[in-house]
A protein has these predicted regions:
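Ligand/cofactor-recognition surfaces for anionic moieties
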Residues: 32
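DNA-dependent DNA polymerase catalytic subunits
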Residues: 1-11, 17-29, 61-65, 69-120, ...
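Active-site-adjacent bridging/hinge elements
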Residues: 2-14, 35-49
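Short acidic/His/Gly/Ser-rich catalytic and metal-binding motifs that mark active-site loops
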Residues: 42-48, 127-128, 136-137
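Short, conserved non-catalytic motifs in the polymerase core
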Residues: 47-60
Length: 414
């Protein structure tokens, strides 16, 4: 490689193809190792496999959580005092040339809004780059006065700037914090060093975190590559799960794109929801507003009146019983069958408050005589409430909260 400058264009192309092939092979090998290790971890905690060993699974989970939390605390503590060391400013100037001062991260409180590590799992931590960018680095305003930096605009150039900032922040600060905190803890325990690794994987422009394993973010960087256009990463949210109709999930996807990728304001999203609310009520398409779940037939029986009933009160039993009674009352048993135990069923609430269930292999728009849905209730449940979870820090909203949001009435904090 030392003599590459003397190579001909032809030889350089050959060298490039060989290097590319080697990198592809290495990345595939990495993927195989990762999949194998994840599989071993998974089967160690699953009773159906011969390799099950709960002690091993607990050790792996506990160790990962321990070091993730350790790194979380170390990162926060570093930024609470980083302005006190002049060397840190010199490092920052390497990627923010007009920086003239640093500010310490004040009021750090673990697992609160005043925590730079805003989300995490057993093997990861998500750092608030926005806060570091806009409040912990001061630049020259042109007259020698220190001012906070303005976050780059939502443009390809702005996203590249954010991604580069995140990469440099990791290079000059975060990587060292992670390495030192892990090394010191391992040394303290007398364990073997060199087997734990943490690295920068993704950088996101905008994120919404709901709770454990439920989040959505706009990726602008992943595994060493900056994207020309942000890509959504979704984990555990409604549009990834089967509890809503495909039509409603598509509608929510459009609204999420506007919120996360196009920086729509809350009022703009509310305006879109109001228009959709009116449209769905006019269209009266049942296949848009149902929810879905698996049902149980084990505890359902016919009473003396010939009605399907159950001593259980959970929703899955009610859904199954409603369909059994509906097809018998309407003489439709020759066209439709009773659900089997564990079957997926779609359901909605009608105008009388009763739950109405239809097996997922039946098109509910073609079933004759189905009761009229409570359109207001179902649109709130399947459209408004899921979107509100992305807009606000809370996860639970009652009917009054939803009505106030639709009408644009802001909650007054007392």
């Amino acid at each position: 490689m030392e003599n590459y400058q003397s190579l001909s264009d032809h030889d350089l192309k050959i060298l490039y193809e060989e290097a590319k092939e080697t990198m592809d092979e290495y990345e595939q090998l990495q993927l195989v190792v990762k999949l194998n290790m994840n599989s071993l971890y998974g089967v160690s905690a699953t009773i159906g496999y011969s390799l099950v060993d709960y002690d091993i699974a607990e050790d792996i989970t506990g160790s990962a959580r321990h070091y993730a939390v350790l790194v979380d605390i170390a990162i926060n503590k570093f930024f609470t005092t980083w302005a006190n060391d002049p060397e840190n400013l010199e490092k920052v100037k390497k990627f923010v040339p007009n920086a003239i001062a640093l500010a310490n991260f004040k009021n750090y409180k673990r697992d609160s809004l005043d925590d730079l590590c805003i989300y995490g799992d057993t093997d990861s931590r998500y750092i608030d780059v926005y806060r570091i960018y806009t409040s912990l680095i001061l630049v020259d305003d042109g007259n020698g006065n220190p001012v906070n930096m303005t976050f780059p605009p939502n443009t390809p150039e702005g996203n590249h700037e954010i991604a580069e900032f995140g990469v440099q922040l990791e290079k000059y600060f975060i990587a060292e914090i992670i390495a030192n905190s892990i090394h010191n803890d391992i040394a303290k325990r007398g364990a073997n060093d060199g087997y734990l690794k943490m690295a920068l994987e993704t950088i996101s422009r905008k994120c919404v975190y709901q709770k454990k394993k439920k989040y959505i973010m706009s990726l602008i960087y992943k595994d060493g590559k900056v994207f020309d256009k942000p890509k959504l990463k979704l984990q555990g949210v409604e549009i990834k799960r089967g509890e809503l109709s495909n039509k409603m999930k598509s509608i929510i996807q459009v609204l999420i794109n506007k919120l996360i990728l196009e920086d729509f304001t809350i009022d703009q999203i509310r305006g879109e929801i109001v228009k959709l609310f009116k449209y769905i009520k006019v269209k009266k398409d049942k296949s848009m507003i149902y929810r879905a779940t698996s049902v149980s037939m084990k505890d359902i029986y016919k009473n003396d009146k010939g009605e399907w009933v159950s001593n259980k009160t959970h929703i899955q039993v009610k859904i199954a019983a409603s369909w059994c009674n509906f097809i018998e009352r309407n003489n439709l048993t020759d066209q439709y069958q009773r659900p089997f135990n564990g079957q997926k069923m779609n359901y909605y609430y009608d105008v009388t408050g009763n739950v109405i269930g239809v097996p997922d292999d039946v098109d509910m728009t073609t079933v004759p005589g189905l009761p009229e849905p409570d359109w207001n209730k179902m649109i709130k449940q399947t459209l408004v409430k899921p979107i509100m979870r992305y807009l606000f820090d809370e996860n639970d909203f009652d009917d009054k909260d939803i009505d106030n949001f639709i009408m644009g009435i802001k909650k007054i904090e007392l």
